[in-house]
Amino acid sequence: MLSEALLVSAPGKVILHGEHAVVHGKVALAAALNLRTFLLLRPQSNGKVSVNLPNIGIKQVWDVGMLQRLDTSFLEQGDVSVPTLEQLEKLKKMGDLPRDRAGNEGMALLAFLYLYLAICRKQRTLPSLDMVVWSELPPGAGLGSSAAYSVCLAAALLTACEEVSNPLKDGVSVSRWPEEDLKSINKWAFEGERVIHGNPSGVDNAVSTWGGALRFQQGTMSSLKSLPSLQILLTNTKVPRSTKALVAAVRSRLTKFPEIVAPLLTSIDAISLECERVLGEMVAAPVPEQYLVLEELIDMNQHHLNALGVGHNSLDQLCQVTAAHGLHSKLTGAGGGGCGITLLKPGLEQATVEAAKQALTSCGFDCWETSIGAPGVSTHSAAAVGDPVRQALGL
């Protein structure tokens, strides 16, 4: 059982190409974003389980004895169990979750409670733990924040209960789990995502578990063997949108104009495949011409997405502002607001990037200069993370 503090992190994700087309059987490329969620798990001896999520202002404490007495017969011994709505409603009541915690806040607590009971149930007595989670990812922006949370939960609880080994050895600052353990972490993280979202695709938790980049088509995922280091500007327009409504709108447009929209989806598929090919070539020795191709693909895909009807004035503004500084941008995810990505090719003057960031910020947007192809779920020594993370986690 856990005898000392455990610090884990997992990345968010962006869709490079293929959003919306993937719903219709086309290829999508998703990459791990180097903005991460961090989880600190400490053993306690006070008979309590405490969860602190400072990003969203949640602190919850349970008595281990009360949790021990819960009827968890629906959690089948030894298997990754699929929660039903009835079971989750029962768990909400049994776990005494605050009624004023609605939406994603309540779901975050419920996901913890579900995974804690499901993973730790083999222990003779449930462990007394203190958990703090802090994220660099904005919630609800389509960047995989809930998946990063679920992956951190799964990795930390499985390690604490010795279902997977702790890969961090003395003198090592960062380490990752072996492949078999990553598969187990991903399976449990997917169940956490089920609790939060009901019917997730599994893409977000897979990207957060393995990192790098994934190719996704018709339910089949495969890892891009390698990915060149790509710097991006990530912009959150902060315009809320409904993924479900946008997906339905594209489907409606396809039904109404099949001979127009079907070729658009086929063309987006070709953009994804061309991007995959170019990225593969860039791994060995990238040349300037390849970045120009990536920029062209970004521009073409953005126009295609506008033609599908998933653009937004805020995203047009993002593209226009960055274009004024010689940069190329597209929406990422569902569209209709949300986030966009801008490629920052090597050799770009920092003054240009800063000017673009300032212009975007003056539009009311949030910006991060970051990279894609980040490592997946990892465990760290306290010294390996930056001061803001240590401060947020109370290290």
UniProtKB/Swiss-Prot annotation:
Annotated residues for binding of Mg(2+): S146, E193
**EC number of this enzyme:** 2.7.1.36
Q: How is its activity regulated?
A: Farnesyl pyrophosphate and geranyl pyrophosphate inhibit mevalonate kinase activity by binding competitively at the ATP-binding sites.
- SUPFAM superfamilies (UniProt xref): GHMP Kinase, C-terminal domain, Ribosomal protein S5 domain 2-like
The entry's keywords:
ATP-binding, Cholesterol biosynthesis, Cholesterol metabolism, Cytoplasm, Kinase, Lipid biosynthesis, Lipid metabolism, Magnesium, Metal-binding, Nucleotide-binding, Peroxisome, Steroid biosynthesis, Steroid metabolism, Sterol biosynthesis, Sterol metabolism, Transferase
Q: Which GO terms describe its biological process?
A: cholesterol biosynthetic process; isopentenyl diphosphate biosynthetic process, mevalonate pathway; negative regulation of inflammatory response
Q: Name one GO molecular function term.
A: identical protein binding
Requisite cofactors:
Mg(2+)
Name the residues annotated as catalytic in the UniProt entry.
Answer: S146 (proton donor), D204 (proton acceptor)
Question: Pfam families given for it?
Answer: GHMP_kinases_C (PF08544), GHMP_kinases_N (PF00288)
Highest taxon listed in the record's lineage: Eukaryota
Q: What does this protein do?
A: Catalyzes the phosphorylation of mevalonate to mevalonate 5-phosphate, a key step in isoprenoid and cholesterol biosynthesis.
Quaternary organization: Homodimer.
**Which PANTHER family does the record associate with it?**
MEVALONATE KINASE
- Report the family membership: Belongs to the GHMP kinase family. Mevalonate kinase subfamily.
Q: What is this protein called?
A: Mevalonate kinase
Taxonomic source organism: Mus musculus (Mouse)
